[in-house]
Amino acid sequence: MRFWGKFFGFVIGFMFGRFFGALLGLWLGHLYDKRPGGGASFSQILGQAKNRQGIFFNTTFAVMGHVAKASGRVTETDIRIATLLMDQMRLTGDARKEAQQAFREGKEPDFDLCSSLQAFRAVTQGRQELVQMFIEIQIQTALSDGELDAAEHAILMTVAQELGYGRQQLDELLKRWQAEFRFHQTSSGNKTSITDAYHLLGITAEATDQEVKRAYRKLMNEHHPDKLVAKGLPPEMMEIANRKAQDIQAAYDRVKSERGMR
């Protein structure tokens, strides 16, 4: 039984990235250990992971640019959302320039949305959490001005379909993100806040306590930062995943408080 890949992957990952790095190293080491005799080397596996992260990074900002231009022109709000995302990711220097360039490319009339999404889907096969987070980022861009026009919805529908999502799934994500946005805007004592807390968790006030817990665990599992990075999320985007997990936790705490749940 091979285990040296997992061992060295864990140790090296922990040295450079503590808990998150150890998880990523353990996963890469696992891939190395289970390869057949003539399979890919550790450096090739690492290269594949980096390539996946690079495609996720560039496609995210390129499609954001395309979504932002959907209404005919890129507004100050669109630019602010892209800048805020870069700030959340703490992008500086070459990484920030790369993101800005990808955003500009997405705004171009000849940007091939479907080809970009097909390449993205090819490297995220079996990593549904990554795909969902990607779609959620595009939804955030489309709703940056608080409204969703027909052109923006059409592009989001194309994004969803190319990545294996149906209209109902997209509408559910739209509903959850809108609830999350409002949840940030309202005070903890506001009735709208508890309604949006339920919507953010993807349930209604009629849900049982058990259903509330199940919905919370499912969402936290889907948005766990370390799991997302291990599946190919660029480390720079970990802060976005952290914030999403915090929002889910806040909504769950709000619902628990309202119900008197332990």
From Swiss-Prot:
Give the Periplasmic compartment stretches of this protein.
Answer: 1-6
What's one Pfam family the UniProt record gives for this protein?
TerB
Function description: Regulatory DnaK co-chaperone. Direct interaction between DnaK and DjlA is needed for the induction of the wcaABCDE operon, involved in the synthesis of a colanic acid polysaccharide capsule, possibly through activation of the RcsB/RcsC phosphotransfer signaling pathway. The colanic acid capsule may help the bacterium survive conditions outside the host.
GO CC annotations?
Answer: plasma membrane
How does it associate, per the subunit comment?
Homodimer.
Q: Which UniProt keywords apply?
A: Cell inner membrane, Cell membrane, Chaperone, Membrane, Transmembrane, Transmembrane helix
Keyword presence, Chaperone: yes
Domain observations? The transmembrane domain is a dimerization domain.
Membrane topology (UniProt): Single-pass type III membrane protein
Note the CDD domains from the entry.
Answer: DnaJ (cd06257), terB_like_DjlA (cd07316)
Domain J: from-to ranges? 196-262
Q: What is this protein called?
A: Co-chaperone protein DjlA
Q: Give the source species.
A: Shewanella oneidensis (strain ATCC 700550 / JCM 31522 / CIP 106686 / LMG 19005 / NCIMB 14063 / MR-1)
Localisation? Cell inner membrane
Single annotated GO MF: protein-folding chaperone binding
| Sections of the chain in a coiled coil | none
- Topology feature Cytoplasmic, residues: 31-262
Q: Report the InterPro entries cross-referenced here.
A: DjlA (IPR023749), DjlA_DnaK_co-chaperone (IPR050817), DjlA_N (IPR007791), DnaJ_domain (IPR001623), J_dom_sf (IPR036869), TerB-like (IPR029024)
* SMART domains (UniProt xref): DnaJ
Q: Where are the transmembrane segments?
A: 7-30
KW Chaperone (keyword) present: yes
